[in-house]
A protein has these predicted regions:
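Proline/glycine-enriched tight loop/beta-turn segments at coil->beta junctions
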Residues: 21-29
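The feature captures the conserved acid-bearing segment of alpha/beta-hydrolase catalytic domains
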Residues: 203-283
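N-terminal cap/lid segment of alpha/beta-hydrolase-fold proteins
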Residues: 1-22
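Gly/Ala-rich beta-loop-alpha elbow adjacent to hydrolase catalytic centers
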Residues: 174-179, 183
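The conserved beta1-alpha1 loop
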Residues: 32-34, 200, 226
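A conserved short beta-strand
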Residues: 192-203
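Serine-hydrolase catalytic machinery in alpha/beta-hydrolase-like enzymes
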Residues: 28-51, 60, 64, 72-75, ...
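Active-site signature of alpha/beta-hydrolase-fold catalytic machinery across serine-
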Residues: 185-189
């Protein structure tokens, strides 16, 4: 199936959308994902600018090429470029998104809009509240609420308008690492998301487990995963990730929230695109 790729700017954020169908009524899922701006590439010949908004496209954020693949339901996902920077070059990062979209769409068996929006400062825009630095002397400023408001009040409504999406299309949010934590947190803050794919989420984040114990998610189902070597780190805070994700699963079980915790082979940097695609597919197929 041929995949159409659109690139545009909204509120000074670059956006890249993959679609496996032009029939809006056949779209069953919308996947929204926040990604580091550099993962969106540097150029694209099929740039689409919303005439009503008159927005200019930041070409440094645009992808290099369109791809042919099958795409799954629309997801929102954020990718931590800081933690994944050793995985690939900038061009490889663009292809990473293409491959991830292809893996999801190949197996989903339904119409999907896979929508990515650019994230500038990872620690600032995806952290739910302020916290001291845990690594590399980079503190967290806690601006996730601003990012969530962009997703719920601007990005998703724009997708619905731009592509004429049906009212019953389910919105899935997900991401890797700190983006996975952001996705979990978002499900506690709003009921717009049908499901969450939290892949290797940063549940070591200071105060997270206390927050999860005192609140209740609004999504129908949650996917959790972690590499079986991720908790083996000398970083005292980040080494809590294993115990905390087990506690997170227990919290969901106690609250009657359908969820799964899947353990993957390897550390935090292994098989990232496969892990993320697998997480999104679980939210669609289970």
């Amino acid at each position: 199936m041929r995949v159409k790729t659109d690139v545009f700017n909204i509120n000074n954020r670059a956006c890249k959308v993959y679609r496996n169908t032009c029939d809006s009524d056949s779209v069953k899922y919308v996947i929204v994902q926040g990604v580091d701006r550099e993962w969106l590439g540097r150029e694209n010949v099929n740039v689409e600018i919303p005439p009503a908004r008159g927005q200019r496209v930041d070409r440094e954020w645009l992808g290099r090429e369109n791809v042919n693949a099958e795409i799954s339901p629309a997801h929102v996902q954020a990718i931590d470029s800081e933690q994944l920077s050793n995985a690939a070059s900038a061009s490889d990062n663009v292809r990473f998104l293409d491959r991830e979209a292809g893996k999801i769409m190949e197996k989903a068996g339904t119409g999907i809009v896979f929508a990515n929006f650019g994230v500038g400062s990872w620690n600032d825009e995806l952290s739910p509240w302020s916290a001291e630095a845990v690594f590399k002397n980079q503190p967290f400023s806690g601006r996730a609420q601003e990012t969530l408001e962009f997703v719920t009040d601007v990005f998703v409504p724009e997708l619905v308008k731009r592509y004429g999406l049906p009212a019953d299309a389910k919105v899935i949010i997900g991401g890797y690492s700190l983006a996975g934590l952001f996705s979990l947190w978002a499900a506690y803050r709003t009921d717009i998301f049908y499901a969450v794919a939290a892949v290797s989420p940063s549940v070591w984040f200071p105060g997270w487990i206390e927050f999860a114990q005192e609140n209740h998610v609004h999504s129908d189902k949650i996917y959790l995963s972690l590499g079986n070597r991720e908790e083996r780190t000398n970083n005292r805070v980040m080494s809590r990730v294993g115990d905390n994700i087990r506690l997170q699963k227990e919290i969901f079980d106690g609250q009657g929230i359908p969820s799964v915790l899947e353990w993957n082979e390897g550390n935090h940097f292994r098989d990232v695109e496969e892990r993320v695609a697998k997480g999104f597919l679980w939210t669609i197929l289970q």
